[in-house]
Amino acid sequence: MNAETTDGKRVSIIGAKRSGIAAALLLQQRGATVYVSDREPVGDAERAFLEHHGIAFEEEGHTDRILEADFSVVSPGIPPHASVIRRLEHEAIPLFSEIEAASWFCPAFIIGITGTDGKTTTSSMVEAICLSGANSREQRVFSAGNIGVPFSSLVGEMRKGDIAVVELSSYQLERCRSFRPDVAVITNIMPDHLDRYGGSMKRYAEAKYRIYAQQRKQDTLVYNADDETLRAHFEGGGAFVPQLVPFSLDRKRASLGGACYAAIEGDWLITVVNGREEKVITGSGLFKRSFRGRHNLENALAAVAATRAAGVDVFPIREALRRFAGVEHRQEYVRTMHGVDWINDSKATNLNALRQALDATPGKLVLIAGGRDKGDDLSDLEERVRQKVSVLVVFGESKAKFTEAFSSVVRVVPALSLEEAVEQAQRYASTGETVLFSPGCSSFDMFESFEERGMRFKKHVEGMQS
């Protein structure tokens, strides 16, 4: 399927959330007859949008009308084993993701970014760098994908010569068949979402690897050489079509990838392009109170490698990194009260992100953790909790699991709500410590999203009397 072959086609869109209705409008504008179907009630805003644009839809179930289609676009939140997917597959109806469908109409240079952790921060840095390095007033930079605006909502505005920075989850990549970023980035691969992949890390990683499946020799693939899974995959002797550009905190390790890489040399973040070294920025120039830690060095390396591959010069990269202050809900500084710093890391929805937050936070801390359990093994955190955490405040569905795992190494205080957790943390935190809200779990037990969870945390912290 491509931009030339959608005109006159019948398309069923499965899922009436943001990406689904964005794909529906795009395909309708490109000549397709579109039908949207959702098993849940359609929201008021989505209903008004669909009715305004004359897009037919159904709700609270999928009728056989979805089978009257030449192909279907499936929203990322619908798992591969869902009954509606089985029905479509039984009728041999081709299934695509919203990202795939949008890419058919994209004339811009695409930088695609995926990984378990660091996607949003890296995407935000890449966007900032590209804006800093835009080579003319006519060149525009668009940011789309996993967390922000759907790709389908923006491709109609893009022109040749623009840059599209697209953040991609494994869910979005699963049904990509021809999507081909000019530069692809994989930040890391750690256990996450394994319930969707039958507990298989291999299947999860394979979904991530679809980001480069259609790349050509002139394209670039940036990967984290410090990640064991990625290092084994890309440095295990296999043949890969795009140019590989590794990044690493260890220059020697990065240099094994060839003539192009990004690494740390002393206090400097450097790139090497065709054997020529370029000093970009020092760690002291990069780090701020709201942006610190080993993982953010890795994110910066990924962003630098990607934007150099896209042709951005070193000077605008340096200037953009100096100004970059981090991303909301990712180790975000909220306030200091009575000598205690309060940090919002609501985006830590898995244990690796929690581990990174513990490593990045200086000194002793009171940790607020909990939420919906993803089946992760908490024992990996025991030594870090012993060394770093003075009091652990737990809430949400997983509080019993956290209590069982850590009550022998640290004082554990249960809370019935996030607000109570904040109040307990204030009670136990001492001057000079940090209160770190880094749940290590998904938000769906009590909140619609990690963003809502983070906003609730910040609102309560900002409202406390000093």
From Swiss-Prot:
What's one GO MF term for it?
Answer: ATP binding
Q: What is its main location?
A: cytoplasm
**Leading EC class:** ligase
Catalyses: UDP-N-acetyl-alpha-D-muramoyl-L-alanine + D-glutamate + ATP = UDP-N-acetyl-alpha-D-muramoyl-L-alanyl-D-glutamate + ADP + phosphate + H(+)
Give the EC number(s) under which this enzyme is classified: 6.3.2.9
Q: Which UniProt keywords apply?
A: ATP-binding, Cell cycle, Cell division, Cell shape, Cell wall biogenesis/degradation, Cytoplasm, Ligase, Nucleotide-binding, Peptidoglycan synthesis
One GO location term (cellular component): cytoplasm
Please give the superkingdom of this protein's source.
Bacteria
> What subcellular locations does the record give?
Cytoplasm
**Entries under InterPro entries matching the protein:** Mur-like_cat_sf, Mur_ligase_C, Mur_ligase_C_dom_sf, Mur_ligase_cen, MurD
> What's its job?
Cell wall formation. Catalyzes the addition of glutamate to the nucleotide precursor UDP-N-acetylmuramoyl-L-alanine (UMA).
What protein am I looking at? Answer: UDP-N-acetylmuramoylalanine--D-glutamate ligase
